[in-house]
Swiss-Prot record:
InterPro entries: AB_hydrolase_fold (IPR029058), Chlorophyllase (IPR048264), Chlorophyllase-like (IPR017395)
Class of this enzyme: hydrolase
Protein name listed in UniProt: Chlorophyllase type 0
Record family assignment: Belongs to the AB hydrolase superfamily. Lipase family.
Notes on how activity is controlled: Inhibited by diisopropyl fluorophosphate (DFP), phenylmethanesulfonyl fluoride (PMSF) or p-chloromercuribenzoic acid (PCMB), but not by N-ethylmaleimide (NEM) or iodoacetamide.
Propeptide: 20-30
Leader peptide range in chain numbering: 1-19
Protein task: Catalyzes the hydrolysis of ester bond in chlorophyll to yield chlorophyllide and phytol.
Effect of residue 264 to N: Severe loss of activity
Effect of residue 161 to A: Total loss of activity
Amino acid sequence: MAKLLLLIFGVFIFVNSQAQTFPTILEKHNSEKITDVFHKGNFQVTNNPIRVKRYEFSAPEPLIIISPKEAGVYPVLLFIHGTMLSNEDYSLFFNYIASHGFIVVAPKLFRLFPPKLPSQQDEIDMAASVANWMPLYLQVVLQRYVTGVEGDLEKLAISGHSRGGKSAFALALGFSNIKLDVTFSALIGVDPVAGRSVDDRTLPHVLTYKPNSFNLSIPVTVIGSGLGNHTISCAPNHVSHQQFYDECKENSSHFVITKYGHMDMLNEFRLSPIAVTMSLMCAQSFRPKATMRRTLGGIMVAFLNAYFRDDGRQYYAIIANRSLAPTNLFAEKKGFNFGFATTYAQL
């Protein structure tokens, strides 16, 4: 009996010491510019996106590349745009990510003239083709336009917004009809959407409606918009960020930028006509979009730094102290409990 009591006491002391350690670490590093991720990074970025036409450099789809100018080796982010949008509609957001030392590759999978309206499965396969293009040709393009810059495909992340967010999950989960020649090392869903409702989802069906069911062994974060499910709902309940996060496994994270809408990370100007229409249709905040881009971009940079640069200080600090973000933020991570609201609706 005495041994049992001693064991219980020892476990209590260990757990309590671990609970105290994390806030101490955060307090120590709060003075070390934790919020730098929420400001433009230190890297100068290519003045204009590198535009690669279809078949140019053997590219399977037209794409843009945004890169730091400074010679070096950088992680790569493959980003899939949202429903009927253009990759160019995100150029300011991509510049923000690149300014923190990342190369962004963003294919264009939809066009109005001449019409190109791919199915979701088509989009997944097209994105897979672009992923397979990168080992052979990304460096060729970079050498042409930015001397001394290299993409590190050992640190390749897949991401996407809206329908493109679902495509990113589908690609990571193996739903492509095209065998991948690359390995994704991280996954970021930006307000992913699987359809208009549970009964009206696009094919293939990625969501299973079973908790922790996604067969993913890589780090995952899901970032949603708080107004995405407001009328007119462009990210409806049960087919958007909360459901995707629920189906992720242990150690994944979830953020909600509560005061912003589904399209609020897009450029203010230089938008495609459909992007303008979609932005007006979806619930939006009318707050500065630059703040949305800083918050979204900062979370993504902190997440990628944690897993690609072995520096998780900013990532964990944001989860534990949401007030570090430029706007209202909900954050949670499976396996961690900081005593906050358990859903963003409770804020």
